[in-house]
């Protein structure tokens, strides 16, 4: 498999799930550092949804309409560690400013 890089938006298989976890085959944004992705056999990612979100930042971040075919939101609270075997093709990547906002959001949620 090609290198998985921080900031990439890739397809991922999030099944099986429990409770309110995001599931199915859907886009995710990779938030873990490249060296972690390369050495661990896993990545840390946030789920993306095309369903309009009522919750704003820091729980969700709306992506620019040009990034994916449908208007989409990153669900910052839906952070998952995934085996690289669950990760598929690259769809696009988020801008560095968007990555900063995602990390800022998770820090607000966990108290960083």
Question: Language-model segments: what does each one mean?
Answer:
Residues 1-112:
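Conserved functional hotspots at enzyme active or ligand-binding sites that engage polyanionic ligands
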């Amino acid at each position: 498999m090609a290198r998985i890089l921080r900031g990439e938006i890739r397809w991922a298989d999030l099944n099986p799930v429990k409770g309110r976890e995001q599931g199915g085959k859907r886009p995710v944004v990779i938030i873990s550092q490249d060296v972690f992705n390369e050495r661990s056999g896993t990545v840390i990612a946030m789920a993306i949804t095309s369903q309009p979100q009522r919750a704003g930042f820091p729980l969700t971040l709306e992506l620019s309409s040009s990034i994916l075919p449908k208007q989409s939101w990153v669900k910052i609270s839906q952070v998952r560690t995934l085996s690289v075997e669950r990760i598929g093709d690259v769809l696009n990547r988020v801008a560095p400013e968007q990555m900063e906002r995602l990390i800022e959001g998770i820090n607000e949620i966990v108290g960083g």
